[in-house]
Amino acid sequence: MAYFIDRRLNGKNKSTVNRQRFLRRYKSQIKQSISEAINKRSVTDIESGESVSIPNADINEPMFHQGRGGRRHRVHPGNDHFVQNDKIERPQGGGGGGSGQGDASKDGEGEDEFVFQISKDEYLDLLFEDLALPNLKKTQHRQMNEYKTHRAGYTANGVPANISVVRSLQNSLARRMAMTAGKRRTLHELEESLEQLAHTEPAQLLEEERLRQEITELRQKIARVPFIDTFDLRYKNYERRAEPSSQAVMFCLMDVSGSMDQATKDMAKRFYILLYLFLSRNYKNVDVVYIRHHTQAKEVDEQEFFYSQETGGTIVSSALKLMEEVVRERYDPSQWNIYAAQASDGDNWADDSPLCHQILANQLLPMVRYYSYIEITRRSHQTLWREYETLRDTFDNFAMQHIRDQDDIYPVFRELFRKQTVGH
């Protein structure tokens, strides 16, 4: 009985290469599906895996087939209903697209969309691809770690896509030379002895036969040494290394006043959860300062920021003043990259909006690397938006976006933190 031993190191992930190729090939369709799916998740379920669906029309392989129309002659085996020149009635209806829209029909056929599961890491990689903190500046002071993938020699374990053919063949050659060096040396000596014995008189037939038999056995032993073995295989190794990058702090300012209903607060929380995941995924150490405000501003921890029920009136400048105080006390602008993300419904005491403009223009914007304002409302913009519009026209490090409903959150997030090209 023959026994087969599976010595492959990635036996449980034999389709890894095909999966990676599939993700690369249909990245645009997968990202589109992810951007649609993220808005359907609960606030606390942002970072798990995801079931991704792709229309079958997008993954069909090219193929040659007969064009529609025209006349063709075919031989159909087993035909006992039609003869030459009979007209075959065209089928009613047509192939469905699997979208589930439209009226039902007893005719036609179609296919469902192709659905597959991506892991948490694949999901987050695609979710935050091509995003970065704007204007991040490196300094000579205390640093945070930003991780990037680098080549790191070779390893005996890996996936087939990373195999190093040259290094594996070098190991194979070295192993075969080491395992057969003694046998080849003995073989060479026996061949020389046989050659000398062949020229001696009288002929020593028994000795010659013995030498030939030993030579044959040695050649068979040498031939049995495998050309390549799993021990020879070497794979290109990659590791994530901490890259020196200036330390940064992100201020999250959220309006929790009475005008912010629960749906608006949930959308603001979704935005901040995306921001938190983006920072924790791409940067090792980034300080995050959470500030909630109504008529008064308060620095809180993560738990209170997302789950506290406290509410009140609206004075936006209280949050800006508190942010300035925290910066002065703990974050020297010469040593820190300072960022801020403010979310509000735009409702503010009318006399306070000009004060917000003044604080941002004179105190905060000269100190920060980037300040983003997100207004979450379906109503028309009020004085705060108009005051901020003048700041956007004056300061390059100030950005503002409008979120009307849940579907706008992820596109707005990508717009605010998309990686800037060299030309920008």
UniProtKB/Swiss-Prot annotation:
Transmembrane intervals: none
Matching InterPro entries: UPF0229 (IPR006698)
Region (Disordered): 46-109
Bias (Gly residues) ranges: 92-101
Family annotation (Pfam families): DUF444
Basic and acidic residues composition-biased segments: 77-90
Stated family: Belongs to the UPF0229 family.
UniProt-recorded name of the protein: UPF0229 protein PC1_1960
Lineage of source species: Bacteria, Pseudomonadati, Pseudomonadota, Gammaproteobacteria, Enterobacterales
